[in-house]
């Protein structure tokens, strides 16, 4: 059965790959990006199965308008994929206020507003799937990635809470957590020069090389499509052995830290249960 998808950030990388695979299998796609002409080649091949619109995900009004227009143009949208975002690498102290605001506006606030804009439509049609591109960086951290991690940890928390709110309406959510995918993500990322105190420190180094990117974007996208086709899509989709290993190590270490706080945690409890208030 064919599906209709709404996808952000489709100009390159996994967003573009997702659009290509969906169209190749006969699905319909509402694709958004800053410059729709970047998909002219796909439009020529697939005609009206590809709907395009310019979108700035940092503009909440534009996000709502794009979602309204996409749902109006299609009988139903089965899957909404939030994929727009970018990386920034540098020591936390060296980041500028503007850089912080812009990354949060795109990676976190933009994703939140996209989900909020889709929810009324998904409720009205009786359900659907919200799929959010997260990262293994939503569970663990590397030096020099502090701001990027903040946005991924933030969207993980938002989706976890929202999932329980929307499940009664037949709306499912999936957080996609790939490892280091071999795309142009690192090339396109903003790199903040290290100030003198941080040069040569833990943060000062090449984030990764092409040879270290072990995750295939084509296979990541294929796994996303399989997840969307499942009767019950997974709440989390971990993709890549590196992601599985690093997430497992991080969560195991965090649980050990919490376990070590068991006795200390109890010291904050009331000495005796609080008395019930009289009405």
Predicted feature residues:
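Substrate-binding pocket helix/loop in short-chain dehydrogenase/reductase
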Residues: 91-92, 96-101
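Residue(s) in the substrate-gating loop at a strand-loop-helix junction
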Residues: 135
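SDR active-site lid
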Residues: 168-234
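Active-site loop immediately N-terminal to the catalytic Tyr-X3-Lys motif
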Residues: 93, 140-146
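The beta1-alpha1 cofactor-binding region of Rossmann-like NAD(H)/NADP(H)-dependent oxidoreductases
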Residues: 55-65, 97
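Conserved glycine-rich cofactor-binding loop
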Residues: 11-13
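Active-site helix of classical SDR
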Residues: 115, 151
């Amino acid at each position: 059965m064919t599906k209709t998808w709404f996808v952000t950030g489709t100009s390159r990388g996994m967003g573009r790959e997702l659009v290509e695979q969906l169209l190749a299998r006969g699905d319909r796609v509402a694709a958004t990006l800053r410059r729709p002409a970047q998909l002219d080649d796909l439009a020529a091949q697939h005609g009206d199965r590809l709907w395009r619109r310019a979108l700035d995900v940092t503009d909440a009004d534009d996000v709502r308008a794009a979602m309204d227009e996409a749902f109006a143009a299609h009988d139903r949208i089965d899957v909404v994929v939030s994929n727009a975002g970018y990386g920034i690498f540098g020591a936390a102290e060296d980041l500028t206020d503007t850089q912080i605001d812009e990354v949060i506006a795109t990676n976190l606030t933009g994703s939140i507003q996209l989900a909020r804009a889709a929810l009324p439509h998904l409720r009205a049609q009786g359900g659907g799937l919200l799929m959010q591109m997260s990262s293994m960086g939503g569970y663990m951290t590397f030096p020099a990635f502090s701001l990027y991690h903040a946005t991924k940890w933030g969207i993980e928390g938002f989706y976890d809470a929202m999932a329980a709110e929307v499940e009664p309406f037949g709306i499912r959510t999936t957080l996609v957590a790939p490892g280091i995918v071999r795309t142009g993500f690192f090339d396109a990322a903003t790199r903040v020069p290290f100030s003198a105190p941080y040069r040569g420190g833990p943060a000062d180094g090449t984030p990764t090389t092409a040879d270290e990117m072990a995750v295939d974007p084509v296979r990541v996208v294929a796994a996303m499509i399989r997840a969307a086709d499942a009767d019950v899509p997974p709440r989390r989709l971990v993709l890549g052995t590196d992601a599985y290993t690093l997430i497992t190590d991080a969560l195991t270490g965090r649980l050990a830290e919490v376990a070590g706080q068991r006795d200390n945690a109890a010291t904050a409890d009331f000495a005796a249960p609080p008395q019930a208030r009289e009405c």
